[in-house]
Amino acid sequence: MGIPGLEGLHTWISIPFSFMYIVAVAGNIFLIFLIMTERSLHEPMYLFLSMLASADFLLATAAAPKVLAILWFHSMDISFGSCVSQMFFIHFIFVAESAILLAMAFDRYVAICYPLRYTILTSSAVRKIGIAAVVRSFFICCPFIFLVYRLTYCGRNIIPHSYCEHIARLACGNINVNIIYGLTVALLSTGLDIVLIIISYTMILHSVFQISSWAARFKALSTCGSHICVIFMFYTPAFFSFLAHRFGGKTIPHHIHILVGSLYVLVPPMLNPIIYGVKTKQIKDRVILLFSPISVCC
């Protein structure tokens, strides 16, 4: 494992990667703590945000420690079982986070298009949606394990990546079933999530532009700004990595594939808490209130 062609730069690459991982862990843990301890934030929008922060923390932690071990200590060995486990958890968390982003889009859709029905999104309903996202992700990703273990491996044991991806490429047999299942999952789960998110925001825009007041329009759309930024950050590098690996061929240098894949598990988890902290007034106000006693004491 590692980043082929950039071995001499591993130490330098580890510096920004370490910074991003520390910020991602600290930011998401703080966001979860803030939402769980502030009763005024116990609303559907923020409960979904706490789920997103949990998924971001887990996604970064599933990959980053091994990436940093490779970059720092040249610890490039990993057992097959550990590699499969890492692959499973990265895919599992990705699919679950995609479902959470869809749930957040639905939350904004109901809040803006049907505000009088927004009370249907109780804390109990939010918990059920969260459980459904986890269960869906589990059943989608479990077959990956069986598909990997069913293959025959003939001694090739080098994964040209900073974490465990594309394990099936090490097999010496036919991997068409694995490829077809991977494409099917990408299209029918994550792809469907994206389509439903687009539909939700199309309906939101339709409702917003029926409002005569520009101030009211801006206020309605401002509640969606953070979510839209997070959606673009989550899906864009993921699909670039997914499509470049399958169709990029030799047009994109291999180390670019690996760097984008590595940044994908660090940059969104790092930036999501910052985006919501800056763009969401309620969270910004609570952060200021939380630290104001410290400022007074100093």
From Swiss-Prot:
Role description: Odorant receptor.
Stated name of the protein: Olfactory receptor 52Z1P
Keywords in alphabetical order: Cell membrane, Disulfide bond, G-protein coupled receptor, Membrane, Olfaction, Receptor, Sensory transduction, Transducer, Transmembrane, Transmembrane helix
Membrane topology: Multi-pass membrane protein
Family: Belongs to the G-protein coupled receptor 1 family.
Extracellular side: 1-14, 65-85, 150-178, 245-257
Membrane topology (Cytoplasmic): 36-43, 107-128, 200-223, 279-298
Organism: Homo sapiens (Human)
Xref: Pfam families: 7tm_4
Subcellular location: Cell membrane
Entry keyword annotation includes Cell membrane: yes
Entry GO terms, CC: plasma membrane
Gene Ontology molecular function, alphabetical: G protein-coupled receptor activity; olfactory receptor activity
